[in-house]
């Protein structure tokens, strides 16, 4: 594993960047205050998709929250949110990120728990077959199934006509 140290003027301590042999980077940055953030950034988004697999990055983002072999669906969120965490993810054109932000806790207990749970979610996700949903026509507005495939399609439909989406798409090709 390769280690790099970077100095930033607005941080009191050096930032450590660890790059694994597979290219995965782990960045550790200390910032004064009572909150911590654990996040993973994945180099995938709609820019990597084509007409046949359009939306797959966003779909996988949703499926990552369906549990792991160690923690069933909902347990990850329940444990962290009970400690005041915000747990979420987002998919953009060129990346997808997953994050947990929460109070550090005594002796960094929440930070350590967040790292453990986040690492489990990122390395051992379970994708239940029933969440895939049956094939359907994306233009069929009568589909009411709430499995993740349909939830993502509905989110795409809702955003597609938003003015900010049109501006973003027109200026970010």
What annotation goes with each model-predicted range?
Residues 69, 77-173:
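Acidic/histidine-enriched segments that form metal/cofactor-coordinating
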Residues 1-78, 99, 116:
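His/Glu-rich zincin catalytic helix
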């Amino acid at each position: 594993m390769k280690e790099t140290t970077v100095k930033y003027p607005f941080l009191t301590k050096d930032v450590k960047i660890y790059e694994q042999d597979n290219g995965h980077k782990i960045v550790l940055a200390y910032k004064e205050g009572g909150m911590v953030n654990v996040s993973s950034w994945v180099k995938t988004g709609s820019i990597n998709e084509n007409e046949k697999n359009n939306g797959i990055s966003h779909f996988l983002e949703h499926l990552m929250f369906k549990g792991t072999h160690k923690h069933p669906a909902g347990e990850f969120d329940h444990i962290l949110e009970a400690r005041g965490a915000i747990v979420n993810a987002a998919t953009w054109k060129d990346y997808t990120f997953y994050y947990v932000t929460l109070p550090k806790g005594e002796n960094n207990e929440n930070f350590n728990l967040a790292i453990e749970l986040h690492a489990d979610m990122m390395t051992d996700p379970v994708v239940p077959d029933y969440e895939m949903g049956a094939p359907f026509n994306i233009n069929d507005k009568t589909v009411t199934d709430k499995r993740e495939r349909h939830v993502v399609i509905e989110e795409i439909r809702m955003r597609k006509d938003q003015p900010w989406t049109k501006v973003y798409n027109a200026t970010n090709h």
